[in-house]
Amino acid sequence: MNNRMKEAADSVLTNTVAESGGAPGVVAMVTDKRANFYEGTAGVREMGKTKPIATDSVFAIFSCTKALTGTTLMQLVEEGLVSLDDPARDYVPDIAEIQVLDGFDSNGQPKLRAPKSDITINQLMLHTAGFGYEFFSHDDLAFRTARETASVVSSTYDGIKSVLLHDPGECWMYGVNLDWVGKIVEAVRGKRLGEVMQERIFNPLGMTDSAFTLTPAMRSRLASLHTRAEDGQLAPWDLVLPQPPEMDMGGHGLYGTVPDYMKFIRMILNDGEGPDARVLNKETVEKMSRNGLVGLQSGGWTTSMPALSNSGEFFPGLKKSWGYTFQINDEPTPSGRPAGQIMWAGLANLFYWIDRQNGIGGMWASQILPFKDISSY
């Protein structure tokens, strides 16, 4: 990257922090197949304090976790230990007990029925199993309230044993599916998901700052979460996911740094090859990057908890699909991303994209709630 382009990129970060109500701190990086060619930071780790945010600052990466969990599942597929068409109940019998929400009675109590078919691993990977999130579904939130079901952020198994909002395979709906995928990986490997990731992703890629449980070194570099009030003002929020978690949440539980995530992105850009070992076969990466939905499209989300997320959609009006497990832009975007580019995000306004066609990818990381915060767009 030449100096002019670096200055332009740096100014985006600086302006994001400097503007009224802007992000307290941001880290952004861009990589090609070989190495990062842009690294930028601006701001502080916590609003009201002076310690600057740095390239090695640790973030709660939330749903950026999903791609790594999906990778551990696809490794099982490569080894012939599972098939995407397998019923999930074969590995996690508890999932067969989850029923479909069929409305509420006059007392606000859920009316439930059995699903019309078993949930498959494929449906979990593609977000078509029927699960939602309490902060993206009024019905899911009402069910949890009526049944006093734990929140998904409790990092407990009970937090994902909620309800199906539609029958398996009926439509695309973003939800706790990858948490169940993580349970499948644990059942097959006989280890916690974090151990599997450590052995099969983090070690081969040299990702030394990624974990479900913060190490003392990671905690010393942790960037604070912040919340934006209705008046637009930001304030630090002293929230850390349960340490250690009862369950390694495959949908949202990882902490990590941007440099670590760039190593994962480079592995995908290099068709599964890491600097010291192969993590995935080329054919697997190609499958992960292709649409797996049949007759369905992925879309946006509607908030049911405005403190955690705004309503929104990535690239509204453009056709989008879902792979294993990324969103895919099926059409070129106004910002110049080609059709077939894969991407996703994390709840605290973290965003990543992987352009395999042109061999580049990047990440933008902040720690602000609600999702789709104005300072991150």
Feature annotation, model-predicted:
Residues N36-F37, L234, G361:
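Hydrophobic "anchor" residues
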Residues A8-T14, A28, R34, A60-Y91, ...:
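Active-site SXXK
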Residues D90-G336:
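Short, surface-exposed loop or secondary-structure junction motifs
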Residues Q341, A348-Q357:
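Short, surface-exposed beta-strand/loop micro-motifs that present aromatic residues
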Residues G40, Y352-W353, G359-L369:
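Short, well-ordered beta-strand elements
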Residues I368-Y377:
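Generic C-terminus detector
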Residues N2-I61, L81-S83, E97-S106, L239, ...:
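Short, conserved catalytic-motif segment at the N-terminal edge
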Residues M5, A9, I61, T65, ...:
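Hydrophobic (often cysteine-bearing) scaffold residues that line and stabilize catalytic clefts
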